[in-house]
Amino acid sequence: MTELQGLIETDRLATLSINGSNSLYWDNVAGLYTSVIIWIPLAITAIFLLIRNINSKRLLLVLLMVVLTIVLCDQLSSSVFKPLVHRLRPTRDPYILDMVDTIKGYRGGLYGFFSGHAANSFGIVTLFILLVKDKWFSIAVLVWAIINSLIRTYIGVHFLGDIIVGAIVGCLLGSFTYWIYNLVTRNDRDRWNVHNSSILYTSSGFMRSDVFMFLCVLFGSYSVIMIGACFTI
C-alpha cells in the first residue's frame, strides 16, 4: 500500500466514524443546520453589522470582498478542483457507499474534493474575524464554521479530508481578500470608525453592542435548530 493509498484509507475510516448516527434527533439537527432558511436572519444581521460599523466610503469595498471571497471559494472548488481531481464523494465511493448514512436520501453530486461548503464557511469567517477583531466573536464564528463543515461529513456527502482542505483554502482566500482590502485602503486613515474605548468598541472600531447582537442571533439560530429538531419528521 502506497502512502497515498494509506492516507485515503485513513480518510475513509475517519469519515465513517463521523458519518451518521442512530439518532433521528441528531439527523434532524443536521438537516436543519444545512437549511439555508435557518441562517437568513444571521446573514441579515451580518450585513447590518457591516453597515453600522464600516466607514461609509469603504462599505461597498467590504461587501465586494465578501462576494469575492464566496465566488473564489465556490469556483475554485466546483470549477477547478472537483473536475480536475475527480475524487468521488463518500456516497459515490464504491468501497464504502453501502456503509454511508445519508439524510432523506441526499447524496450530493459526483465529486467532492474539496468541500465548497467548508471553503465558503471558513473564507467568510476569516474575513469577518479580520474585520471585526473581537475575541468572542472570533471563537463563536469559528465554532459555527467547524460545525457547518463537519455536518457535511455527518450527512455523508464529504470525506473529512475534503473538509480539512476546504477549510484551509477558505482561510487562505479570506485572508487574501482582506489583504486586498488593506492594500486598497492603506492610505485611508478613516477606513475604520475607530474609537478609544476598548469597552464599547473593538480594536477595529466595531461597536461591541452590535457584535453582541450578532452573537445573540447566532445562538438564537442554534436554539431554533435544537428545538425544531424535536418536531421535524
Residue ranges of predicted features:
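Hydrophobic alpha-helical transmembrane segments
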Residues: T34-L50, L64, H117-N120, A140
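Hydrophobic, lipid-facing residues on alpha-helical transmembrane segments of integral membrane proteins
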Residues: I37, L64-L76, V80, I164, ...
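Interfacial segments of alpha-helical transmembrane regions
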Residues: F48-L76, F137-A140
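Membrane-embedded catalytic cores of phosphoryl/pyrophosphoryl-handling enzymes
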Residues: D101-I233
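Membrane-water interface at transmembrane helix exits
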Residues: I47-I51, C73, S77-H86, I129, ...
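N-terminal transmembrane-helix/juxtamembrane module of multi-pass inner/ER membrane proteins
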Residues: M1-L42, S77-R107, G228-I233
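N-terminal signal-anchor transmembrane alpha helix
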Residues: M1-E3, L64-L84, F219-I225
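Hydrophobic core of alpha-helical transmembrane segments in multi-pass integral membrane proteins
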Residues: P41-L50, V67-V71, M213-G228
